[in-house]
């Protein structure tokens, strides 16, 4: 588990960016696979989620995960939230309720954890390229502001994800972003006639543009096997038929 230096300063919250070590799964899911949507044994995944919850002192019954759909849809979880077996469809969660853990799972996409140190509100965002393109980050931050947040009180941490050097994209991908945002050109690099995209840096840029200055980026490339993270792109390259998911969690104590 990786802890953010910035978020670790606050005793009111618990959080963690988890790698693939320390779980119960085997084979291509070895070992802390937290992807309920993967083809791994459900029993193993549920045991892995219990391990994660224990690490951040949370009841596994109080962990909320989404059926992530690469959207800009988010949910505000209030004290009346009823825990159901069926997960909500979306890609970000927000709450001000104590002891409710918000989690997102990734396998190269960018996990973002946000804390309002004044209002004691937390958010967990799954920021894949589609969600970023659909402005999920902007929508979450604007919602927080609507709830009374001031951007000077927001702490945002970008967790481990695929880095630019490993994220090759096609021309139509680049064109799509350039058409929407001319500034995105600074996040594309050409090397040996191949185009690469710095998704995590682009997320950082978006958060900064929205007025958040208290930012941290955890520079761990999920694609690089030595960093011990699950990676969708690496699994596809290795011709594996599925892949595990890394989880990132935040909770108000």
Label every model-predicted segment.
Residues 1-253:
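Active-site microenvironment for binding and transforming phosphate-containing groups
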């Amino acid at each position: 588990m990786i802890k953010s230096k910035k978020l670790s300063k606050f005793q009111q919250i618990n959080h963690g960016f988890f790698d693939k070590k320390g779980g119960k799964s085997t084979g291509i899911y070895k070992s802390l696979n937290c992807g309920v949507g993967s083809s791994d044994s459900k029993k193993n995944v549920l045991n892995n989620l219990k391990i994660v919850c224990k690490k951040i002192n949370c009841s596994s019954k109080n962990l909320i995960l989404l059926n992530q759909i690469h959207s800009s849809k988010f949910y505000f979880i209030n004290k009346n939230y009823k825990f159901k077996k069926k997960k909500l469809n979306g890609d970000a969660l927000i709450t001000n309720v104590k002891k409710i853990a918000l989690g997102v799972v990734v396998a190269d996409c960018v996990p973002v954890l946000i804390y309002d140190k004044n209002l004691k509100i937390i958010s967990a965002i799954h920021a894949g390229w589609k969600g970023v393109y659909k402005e999920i980050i902007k929508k979450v931050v604007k919602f927080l502001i609507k709830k009374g947040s001031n951007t000077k009180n927001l702490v945002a941490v970008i967790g481990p994800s695929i880095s630019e050097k490993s994220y090759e994209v096609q021309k139509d991908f680049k064109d799509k972003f350039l058409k929407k945002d001319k500034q995105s050109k600074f996040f594309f690099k050409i090397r040996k006639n191949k185009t690469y995209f710095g998704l995590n840096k682009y997320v950082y840029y978006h958060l900064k543009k929205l007025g958040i200055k208290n930012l941290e980026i955890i520079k761990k490339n999920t694609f690089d096997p030595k960093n011990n993270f699950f990676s969708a792109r690496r699994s596809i390259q290795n011709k594996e038929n599925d892949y595990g998911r890394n989880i990132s969690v935040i909770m108000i104590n």
